[in-house]
């Protein structure tokens, strides 16, 4: 008897349909000595091992299969490698239906995904949101998943999602006991709006550092990458962690995409649904290239994709592998990463704000107001050369951070709240959304192309003259020219100004500390 069950496989962020075909045959005579279980269709080790899990789960759930049966299982399409443990549930149901222990027609319009424990319990699998989206797009009526995945899958509207704790519950439901499983209710928009109000960090907690906080406001308003240079303990990490709190709130579409990435990576918490806060990722500097960019034997999103729609913070930037840092250059421009391996070729999104932090020299105290630096100009220059020019070029805002005096820490009042700063940032982003509405793929000032600078930046004659003067007097490099205009345009947007003035240019020039040719030579 041949039974067909619908399930799905992951390919990058997307899910693709997989048909599990289970052919059951009674063995007689000498055939009884033959191997009784065959799997075809490019299953990996985890899928091959499912045979033992499924047989034990069936036995411990009270289902007794007849002896001397041969099972041939095909995972179609057969030319795509099948990975993971999510095929356990459809395989078990196929074996039961092949032995007339449940009606095969009851499974025709349902997608089944889930890992089985030896006791028949259902365990969560990764990528459930992508699978639910695919199931709805293909017109299936329902999706049966482990209970721990039900909230995640129920985010997708117009699809019935049933969460099951055990295999026995699923079998009872398919045998007509409709009260064995209940559909999971989830009001996506209401839950999303409620969860967005939680902000874990606030700029009001930061004492002093008025200039640095202003730089972060400009960065958030224009989507600019930021590089902080300062001695140890001056608050670089503290401020970087608070950057997501002033970024515009995630839209529902951004939230769905961000949740998909975390789900595929297996990092979405059990019984959770949507990620409603912008991600903040801060990997250690000994991270491998594959962990940062993505890849591996089985494709996994890297840190740059995990930070999609959020912030990637690289502390101690010069300590990161040179190859890992250089590998980020193209994804920073394209806002996506294509990973090609022998077994797969996938493209993952990675549109994020990059925030880097580093010491100004090997000893760390070159810019410290009281502690003397013990490094020579040559040592400082050599230290800075660990960051290549093309990567340094990706940082629109480069600022020096100095320690806050002790008396200011104890007496200074609370700073401006993140909520107040965010209001100005959102207003500036709205102006940019309107400005770039006719330019596909451009959403903020940091993404402007070179030819758009002349067309859309709108510099006043005084601003143009101030920029020329700054380039000459400060001996700024050529790559700083376009970056200054982009940042100045953002400063103008924060002030709701249509044109970029000379004052806007002056502030933008102040954010190019490391671009001076004489930096670190003193």
How does the language model describe each region?
Residues 1-227, 231, 237, 340, ...:
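Peripheral, non-AAA+ core regions of ATP-driven protein-machinery
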Residues 40-51, 66-67, 74-84, 298-299, ...:
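Basic, amphipathic alpha-helical bundle interface domains used for macromolecular binding and assembly
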Residues 228, 314, 357:
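Hydrophobic anchor at the beta1->P-loop junction of P-loop NTPases
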Residues 227-269, 334:
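Walker A/P-loop
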Residues 119, 314-321, 364:
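Catalytic P-loop NTPase motifs of RecA-like helicase/translocase cores
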Residues 309, 315-316, 327:
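Walker B catalytic acidic pair
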Residues 179-218, 222, 249-304:
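P-loop NTPase nucleotide-binding/switch module
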């Amino acid at each position: 008897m041949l039974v067909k069950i619908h399930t799905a496989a992951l390919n990058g962020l997307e899910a693709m349909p997989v048909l599990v075909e289970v052919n059951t045959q009674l063995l007689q005579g000498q055939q009884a000595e033959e191997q009784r279980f065959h799997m075809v269709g490019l299953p990996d080790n985890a899928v091959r091992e499912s045979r033992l899990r499924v047989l034990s789960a069936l036995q411990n759930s009270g289902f007794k299969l007849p002896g001397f049966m041969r099972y041939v299982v095909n995972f179609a399409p057969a030319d795509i490698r099948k990975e993971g443990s999510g095929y356990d549930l459809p395989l078990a149901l196929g074996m039961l239906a092949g032995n007339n222990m449940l009606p095969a027609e009851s499974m025709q319009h349902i997608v089944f995904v889930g890992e089985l424990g030896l006791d028949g319990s259902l365990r969560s699998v990764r990528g459930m949101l992508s699978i639910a989206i695919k199931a709805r797009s293909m017109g299936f009526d329902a999706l049966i998943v482990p209970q721990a995945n039900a909230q995640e899958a129920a985010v997708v509207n117009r699809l019935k999602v049933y969460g099951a704790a055990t295999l026995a519950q699923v079998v009872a439901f398919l045998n007509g006991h409709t009260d064995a499983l209940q559909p999971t209710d989830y009001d996506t928009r209401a839950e999303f709006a409620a969860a967005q109000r939680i902000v874990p960090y606030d700029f009001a907690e930061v004492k002093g550092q008025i200039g640095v906080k202003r730089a972060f406001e400009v960065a958030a308003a224009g989507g600019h990458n930021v590089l902080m240079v300062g001695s140890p303990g001056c608050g670089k990490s503290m401020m970087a962690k608070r950057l997501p709190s002033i970024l515009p709130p995630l839209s529902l579409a951004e939230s769905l995409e961000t949740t998909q990435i975390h789900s595929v990576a297996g990092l979405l918490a059990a019984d959770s649904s949507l990620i409603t806060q912008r991600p903040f990722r801060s990997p250690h500097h000994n991270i491998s290239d594959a962990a940062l960019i993505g890849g591996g034997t089985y494709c996994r999103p890297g840190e740059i994709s995990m930070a999609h729609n959020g912030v990637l913070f690289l502390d101690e930037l010069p300590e990161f592998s040179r190859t890992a840092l250089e590998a980020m250059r193209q994804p920073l421009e394209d806002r996506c990463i294509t990973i090609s391996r022998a077994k797969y070729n996938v493209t993952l999104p990675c549109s994020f704000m990059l925030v880097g932090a580093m010491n100004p020299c090997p000893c760390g105290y070159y810019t410290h107001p009281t502690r003397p630096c013990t490094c020579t100009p040559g040592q400082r220059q050599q230290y800075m050369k660990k960051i290549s020019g093309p990567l340094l070029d990706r940082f629109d805002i480069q600022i020096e951070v100095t320690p806050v005096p002790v008396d200011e820490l104890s007496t200074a009042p609370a700073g401006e709240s993140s909520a107040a700063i965010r209001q100005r940032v959102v207003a500036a982003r709205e102006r940019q959304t309107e400005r770039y509405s006719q330019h596909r793929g451009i959403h903020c000032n940091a993404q402007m192309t070179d030819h758009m600078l002349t067309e859309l930046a709108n510099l006043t004659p005084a601003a143009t003259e101030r920029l020329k003067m700054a380039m000459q007097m400060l001996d700024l490099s050529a790559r700083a020219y376009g970056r200054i205009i982009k940042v100045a345009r953002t400063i103008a947007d924060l002030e709701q100004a249509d044109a970029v003035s000379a004052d806007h240019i002056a502030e933008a020039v102040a954010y190019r500390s490391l671009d001076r040719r004489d930096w670190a030579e003193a």
